[in-house]
């Protein structure tokens, strides 16, 4: 009904592990119909931000479970649990924590402490509600990195401006 009245509807979400089509399908399964253009995710915000603010050298991608994370003219490397690969990265982006564990946490912390580099965090949530539980989200783990000596990251999702600027455009 809102659309019939000329009201623009947007979903602004911190979901970054998957691409927009997965979020659209998830909303559709709940009876909520949105087009890809009506969904603005923190993954979208990260892609736009990094397209205009490309870090030098390869970007290590952490927490991606959806389609490949790509930025034009930037080497994006899906990281595995191999510390030597971490050392080859010039910066990192954390998309989500679905598969995160203490090994990932320790490798990222040690890599950033040994060689400080930019860390971009697409999803700045600490926890997220689900039907029967709460999930632990990237900001929870990042807070432990900071407490243990890692530099502050670049936050790209809600409540930070990048995602809202994207939604308003």
Label each residue range with its predicted role.
Residues 1-169:
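HAD-like aspartate-dependent phosphatase fold
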């Amino acid at each position: 009904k809102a659309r019939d009245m000329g009201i623009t509807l947007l979903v602004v979400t911190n979901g970054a592990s998957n691409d927009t089509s997965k979020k659209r399908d998830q909303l559709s399964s709940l009876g909520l119909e949105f087009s890809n253009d009506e969904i603005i995710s923190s993954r979208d915000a990260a892609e736009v931000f990094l397209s205009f603010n490309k870090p030098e050298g390869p970007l290590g991608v952490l927490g991606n479970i959806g389609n490949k994370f790509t930025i034009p003219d930037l080497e994006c490397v899906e990281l595995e649990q191999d510390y030597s690969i971490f050392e080859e990265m010039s910066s990192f982006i954390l998309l989500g924590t679905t598969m995160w564990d203490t090994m990932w946490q320790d490798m990222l912390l040690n890599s950033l402490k040994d060689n400080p580099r930019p860390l971009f965090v697409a999803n700045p949530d600490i926890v997220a509600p689900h039907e029967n539980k709460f999930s632990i989200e990237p900001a929870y783990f990042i807070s432990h990195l900071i407490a243990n000596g890692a530099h502050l990251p670049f936050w790209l999702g809600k409540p930070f401006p990048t995602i809202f600027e994207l939604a308003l455009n």
